Amino acid sequence: MSDIHVTPVFADAAPCASPAPEKINLLDLDRRQMREFFVQMGEKPFRADQIMKWIYHYCCDDFDAMTDINKVLRARLKQVAEIRAPEVAVEQRSSDGTIKWALQVGDQRVETVYIPEDDRATLCVSSQVGCALECKFCSTAQQGFNRNLRVSEIIGQVWRAAKIIGAQKVTGNRPITNVVMMGMGEPLLNLTNVIPAMEIMLDDFGFGLSKRRVTLSTSGVVPALDKLGDTIDVALAISLHAPNDTIRDEIVPINRKYNIDMFLGSVRRYLEKSNANQGRVTVEYVMLDHINDGTEHAHQLAECLKDTPCKINLIPWNPFPGAPFGRSSNSRIDRFSKVLMEYGFTVIVRKTRGDDIDAACGQLAGEVIDRTKRTLKKQAAGEPINVREV
């Protein structure tokens, strides 16, 4: 939202017959836009800083509770603005402490996952309703695509989770320390809204997270990745998942447009501009049984990544109904990992979290009204359908 138009409304304004204008959701505004909003109201820019602290430091959505704001301004704000985050439609709790929320965004739902650990708590955030990329091993991709999320619907996931976790301090839940843009959708296909949302995550008057604790994961939209590097500095993770173009063309179809060499070239350009990544990118590699998990694939991957400073995150595949894959055995993952380590790579095998509530990597689905008609096309072709699609 580049231009903000506010018609100041005073508490004693006379009623009129025309319908009231739609209120501005302050969660849609970054700090620059928030200051512009208050200037247009005839207020000093510092009011934006005050309001943002209430919204993000205290998870406050009630203007009347903002005690250092004078009553006249509070009354005016209630007439022209609101603080509205997505509401929780369904909450599920895993036996390992992971929490998944299905959040209502209009007439659909997206999923957000809170993952507590001993030394941190990570929130996995969605950027789109559904996903257009059709990665074959991902549940979200099978739902089709509807629309991009607004800034308020992205940062609102963090706000809603922080409010819930903050209200549960007596349970010992750890406050959110990290945010990963790894939920539903491809973040680089929604840069217009993802960048302002991440700026609020980083802003001292927002959530105040370190740029090393905000991570964007992408499947390889190369022009958008180049643009990201010119706009904001956050940690980067790449969804590679294959050691060569032949396999990646099949399981990550965007590779047919931006192949591995193009993708890794863009990654290296990003690293040259970034401080958040400390000189290396996280490579995500889902382990699919007898598809991409052989020792020959490990050698190919090492050769593929030899010029890209990275650490490699091996992800045991998390199943969903109708998927034509199997999870690699622990022994195959172990052999694969050892080959990479012999080349000098840092390798981490991701611990599966929340799989008992379909909250693990690749399992998020939500409720998507598919504008791509992907489910109908699959029915017509006689292909298996994820049971969560219908």
UniProtKB/Swiss-Prot annotation:
Keywords annotated in UniProt: 4Fe-4S, Cytoplasm, Disulfide bond, Iron, Iron-sulfur, Metal-binding, Methyltransferase, rRNA processing, S-adenosyl-L-methionine, Transferase, tRNA processing
GO MF annotation terms: 4 iron, 4 sulfur cluster binding; metal ion binding; rRNA (adenine(2503)-C2-)-methyltransferase activity; rRNA binding; tRNA (adenine(37)-C2)-methyltransferase activity; tRNA binding
Cofactors that this protein relies on: [4Fe-4S] cluster
SUPFAM superfamilies: Radical SAM enzymes (SSF102114)
Binding site for S-adenosyl-L-methionine: 185-186, 217, 239-241, 318
Domain named Radical SAM core: residues: 117-356
Pfam families in alphabetical order: Radical_SAM, RlmN_N
Cofactor note as given: Binds 1 [4Fe-4S] cluster. The cluster is coordinated with 3 cysteines and an exchangeable S-adenosyl-L-methionine.
Residues reported to bind [4Fe-4S] cluster: 131, 135, 138
Keyword flag Disulfide bond: yes
GO CC terms: cytoplasm
Catalytic-site annotation from UniProt: 111, 361
CDD domains, per database record: Radical_SAM
Disulfide pattern: 124-361
Catalytic activity as recorded in UniProt: adenosine(2503) in 23S rRNA + 2 reduced [2Fe-2S]-[ferredoxin] + 2 S-adenosyl-L-methionine = 2-methyladenosine(2503) in 23S rRNA + 5'-deoxyadenosine + L-methionine + 2 oxidized [2Fe-2S]-[ferredoxin] + S-adenosyl-L-homocysteine; adenosine(37) in tRNA + 2 reduced [2Fe-2S]-[ferredoxin] + 2 S-adenosyl-L-methionine = 2-methyladenosine(37) in tRNA + 5'-deoxyadenosine + L-methionine + 2 oxidized [2Fe-2S]-[ferredoxin] + S-adenosyl-L-homocysteine
Subcellular location: Cytoplasm
EC number: 2.1.1.192
GO biological process, one term: rRNA base methylation
Domain of life: Bacteria
Claim: Transit peptide is one of the keywords in the record: no
Family from the record: Belongs to the radical SAM superfamily. RlmN family.
Additional detail: Reaction proceeds by a ping-pong mechanism involving intermediate methylation of a conserved cysteine residue.
Protein known as: Dual-specificity RNA methyltransferase RlmN
Source organism of this protein record: Edwardsiella ictaluri (strain 93-146)
